[in-house]
């Protein structure tokens, strides 16, 4: 961009000021120092005046344009430093050749020149190593000499340092100092080392100084942008809203040029919006002397929170001019609020007038004058003296960058009437607060700022947040109603519906009780000692006296919830088991749905277990225990269990849960929901009687394994040895429990289903046809008895094949011979003959019906799909 041909979008400035700014930007690289902060006349040219007043908004806009143009020129005219880097790599290769010739190069020195970033970070080590190497080559000693270069005169060293300083001040236009050795005093190698040291320092000075100025420019752009956009917030005018959105565009170093083009294209809109906003903003000006007190409306407690407080202003007029002060101010320029080295200053208070709600300021440095003023604390902005981004995070002023927007202070240099602007182009607010100042706000909410036209985080909020060391005494006017506080005791208790109600001081409580709710409307007098109504105090004491009311600590609330559930379970179990404990502590326990389900399940199992007189799994003769114990025994067991749980609960322990009990209850609930009823009881009892027919034979086999001889009835006496061998094969299993691991019932009868799948049982048909009055009274339909008789006769005569058992698909069957025997011994003999016959044959006929029996109980494999039903 040709700055002479393309006008810069400055506004409201005189022609001479615009020319001054344009010349500075056009000839930036020709200046001795390109730092904009070192040219105060340039930043002062951005000031816009309306008569004797300075327009803050328009001045900020021109400063923003100035910093944008400065960043643009700084980036466009940055020279290429790669030429210097190429010279550095060439000289480094010369040094490497010497080190290789001496066998001293281990690769460490060469790796430091691999890239620019690594070179910059390790240059201090490189410089020290080069000096030691040059001194060793020149003087033959490894002792480092405290000189910046090897065997150079002090004059040459001074000229080199001046050259480096000039390059640091103006990195856009620099000259390379020529280090030569016309009389060959040092030699080519020493001269190369000196050049390498100098070029390394020059490269770092150029790159680091440019990066520093670029960061300063970006920081000033962002801060000024936030100030300017803060002025334009909360307006309904389209131009102002549009300008506010444009100024809120997030910026980076790469986007500055595009943002500058946007401002140039929308110059008319932004200018008109700023003009309309400036016209609506009124500045209060008072003509006072330099040492007069400035009186303001005091901040009282009865002022509404949205009251517009007056802004502080200082008159620029002065009765007499101080030439010394004027000269000092012009030479010193005005500090910017982003000065990197300076720290924020605060108001020094001479005294605090609490009666008049005023603060007497002592030596408030405003525009170079030491004045005193009385001002409300809320009308003083803490943006004073902030000069660097590092100061934003100061412990005395913890404010974000966006919070530094427009200020309420209209400050000017009183010595000569100029707007006090530092080299950075930002106002200098040298207002100081002492750390021991105290302020009485009388309960007024200082966080509601209506006077500042800054960013959302500016204004009184920033003032209050900035008082890091101030004592703010606020009146406690917002006091909760006395009934909502309870200071009677420092304990917690539980209300009737298990809601924890804290009793600690100052903590409100709620009693979820109808009587208590009614008492709130009736009683309006409260206890002066506890802050609770007399009626509620009486109810609290009454609730504490109840057995169910337990005092708890606040930290034990999670544990108490678990204990409460255990207590409920114990109370419910007492009603179910008939225990002597009082089960009426829980309201509505007898009518709960869970209690009814438990009672129905217990009644169901009690009736079911009365009909079971043998344990199928254990198989012992005369054993009266089955899969589920009897009803009375179960009640005793449950009663004892819950008594133990009660003791454990009282001792603070968690009662152990019964997995079998949980599983049984879950199954009972499924049975009850399926509506099986009494038919399931009958079905289970009949099934148990059916499968217990073969227990006698199984018991004899087990007794033989313990030493009792197994006597098998056979007509072939000569085959005694083979019979004993077969018995030994039968008894190969050493563990009796392993004999029954594959025990199962297999049949195709629809009327008799396995009890382990009762929820899926098909009860669509009438069960009377398949029910059993007694296990020994069952008869097979048709000619079933005749077929079994023929099969047994074949066994007796020693036939090798068994007869087919044609069994109906819808009826259960039992061998008829087992029902006709008169004594148990005869029945055992018949079963033993069938077992022996199965083992001797090895396999059965393929047409026999597979079903559960003794052979399967002994884990005897039946080949194919045939088996003998027992």
From Swiss-Prot:
It comes from the Viruses. GO terms for molecular function: structural molecule activity. InterPro entries: Herpes_UL11/UL32 (IPR010340). The keyword Phosphoprotein applies. It is found in: Virion tegument. Keywords: Phosphoprotein, Virion, Virion tegument. One of its GO terms (cellular component) is viral tegument. Phosphorylated at multiple sites. Pfam families: Herpes_UL32. Residues 612-649 have a biased composition (Basic and acidic residues). Residues 612-662, 840-870 are annotated as: Disordered. The keyword Phosphoprotein applies. Belongs to the herpesviridae large structural phosphoprotein family. This is Large structural phosphoprotein. The lineage of its organism: Viruses, Duplodnaviria, Heunggongvirae, Peploviricota, Herviviricetes. The gene is U11.
């Amino acid at each position: 961009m040709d700055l002479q041909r393309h006008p810069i979008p400055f506004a409201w400035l005189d022609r001479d000021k615009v020319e001054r700014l344009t010349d500075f930007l056009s000839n930036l690289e020709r200046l001795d120092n390109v730092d904009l902060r070192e040219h105060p006349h340039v930043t002062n040219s951005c000031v816009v005046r309306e008569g004797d007043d300075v327009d803050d908004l328009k001045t900020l806009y021109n400063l923003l344009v100035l910093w944008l143009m400065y960043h643009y020129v700084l980036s466009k005219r940055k020279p290429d430093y790669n030429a210097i880097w190429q010279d550095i790599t060439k000289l480094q290769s010369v040094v490497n050749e010497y080190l290789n010739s001496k066998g001293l190069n281990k690769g460490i020195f060469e790796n430091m020149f691999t890239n620019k970033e690594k070179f910059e970070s390790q240059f201090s080590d490189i410089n020290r190593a080069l000096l030691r190497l040059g001194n060793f080559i020149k003087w033959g000693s490894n002792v480092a000499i405290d000189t910046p270069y090897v065997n150079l005169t002090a004059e040459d060293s001074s000229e080199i340092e001046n050259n480096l300083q000039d390059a640091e001040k103006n990195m856009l236009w620099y000259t390379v100092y020529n280090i030569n050795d016309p009389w060959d005093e040092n030699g080519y190698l020493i001269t190369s080392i000196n050049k390498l040291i100098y070029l390394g320092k020059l490269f770092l000075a150029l790159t680091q100084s440019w990066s520093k100025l670029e960061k300063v420019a970006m920081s000033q752009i962002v801060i000024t942008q936030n100030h300017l956009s803060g002025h334009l917030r909360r307006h309904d005018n389209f131009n102002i809203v549009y300008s506010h959105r444009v100024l809120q565009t997030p910026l980076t170093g790469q986007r500055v040029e595009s943002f500058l083009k946007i401002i140039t294209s929308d110059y008319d809109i932004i200018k008109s919006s700023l003009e309309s906003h400036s016209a609506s903003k009124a500045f209060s000006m008072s003509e006072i002397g330099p040492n007069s007190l400035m009186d303001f409306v005091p901040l009282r407690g009865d002022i509404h929170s949205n009251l517009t407080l007056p802004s502080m202003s200082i008159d620029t007029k002065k009765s007499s001019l101080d030439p010394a002060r004027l000269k000092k101010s012009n030479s010193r320029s005005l500090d910017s609020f982003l000065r990197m080295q300076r720290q924020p200053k605060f108001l020094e208070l001479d005294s605090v007038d609490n009666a008049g709600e005023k603060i007497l300021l002592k030596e408030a440095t405003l525009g170079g004058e030491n004045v005193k003023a009385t001002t409300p604390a809320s009308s003083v902005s803490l943006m004073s003296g902030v000069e660097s981004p590092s100061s934003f995070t100061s412990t005395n002023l913890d404010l974000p960058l966006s919070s530094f927007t427009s200020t309420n202070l209209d400050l000017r240099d009183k010595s000569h009437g100029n707007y006090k602007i530092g080299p950075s182009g930002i106002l200098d607010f040298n207002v100081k607060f002492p750390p021991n100042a105290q302020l009485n706000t009388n309960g007024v909410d200082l966080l509601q700022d209506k006077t500042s036209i800054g960013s959302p985080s500016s204004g009184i909020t920033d003032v209050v947040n900035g008082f890091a060391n101030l004592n703010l005494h606020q009146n406690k006017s917002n006091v909760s109603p006395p009934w909502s506080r309870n200071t009677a005791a420092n304990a917690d208790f539980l209300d009737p519906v298990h809601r924890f109600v804290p009793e600690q001081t100052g903590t409100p409580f709620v009693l979820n009780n109808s009587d208590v709710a009614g008492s709130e409307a009736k009683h309006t007098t409260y206890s002066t000692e506890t802050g609770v109504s007399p009626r509620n105090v009486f109810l609290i004491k009454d609730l504490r006296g109840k057995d169910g009311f337990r005092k708890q600590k606040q930290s034990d609330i999670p544990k108490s919830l678990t204990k409460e559930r255990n207590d409920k379970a114990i109370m419910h179990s007492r009603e179910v088991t008939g225990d002597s404990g009082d089960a009426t502590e829980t309201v509505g326990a007898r009518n709960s749905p869970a209690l009814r389900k438990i009672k129905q399940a217990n009644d169901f199992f009690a009736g079911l277990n009365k009909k079971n007189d043998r344990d199928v799994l254990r198989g012992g003769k005369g054993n009266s225990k089955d899969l589920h114990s009897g009803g009375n025994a179960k009640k005793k067991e449950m009663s004892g269990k819950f008594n133990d749980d009660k003791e454990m609960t009282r001792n603070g322990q968690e009662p152990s849960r019964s997995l079998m009990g949980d599983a049984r209850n879950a199954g009972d609930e499924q049975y009850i929901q399926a509506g099986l009823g009494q038919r399931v009881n009958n079905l289970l009892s009949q099934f148990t009687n059916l499968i217990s027919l073969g227990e006698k034979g199984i018991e004899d086999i087990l007794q033989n394994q313990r030493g009792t001889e197994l006597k098998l009835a056979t007509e072939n006496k000569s085959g005694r040895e083979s019979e004993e061998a077969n018995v030994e094969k039968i008894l190969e299993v050493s563990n009796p429990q392993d004999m029954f691991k594959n025990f199962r019932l297999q049949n195709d009868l629809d009327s008799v289903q396995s009890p382990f799948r009762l929820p899926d049982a098909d009860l669509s048909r009438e069960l009377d046809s398949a029910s059993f009055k007694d296990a020994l009274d069952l008869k097979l339909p048709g000619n079933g008895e005749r077929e079994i008789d023929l099969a047994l006769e074949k066994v007796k005569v020693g036939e090798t094949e068994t007869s087919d058992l044609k069994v109906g698909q819808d009826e259960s069957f039992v061998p008829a011979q087992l029902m006709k025997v008169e004594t148990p011994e005869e029945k055992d003999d018949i079963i033993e003959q069938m077992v022996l016959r199965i083992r001797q044959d090895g396999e059965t006929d393929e047409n026999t019906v597979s079903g559960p029996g003794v052979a399967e109980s002994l884990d005897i494999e039946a080949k194919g799909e045939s088996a003998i039903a027992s």
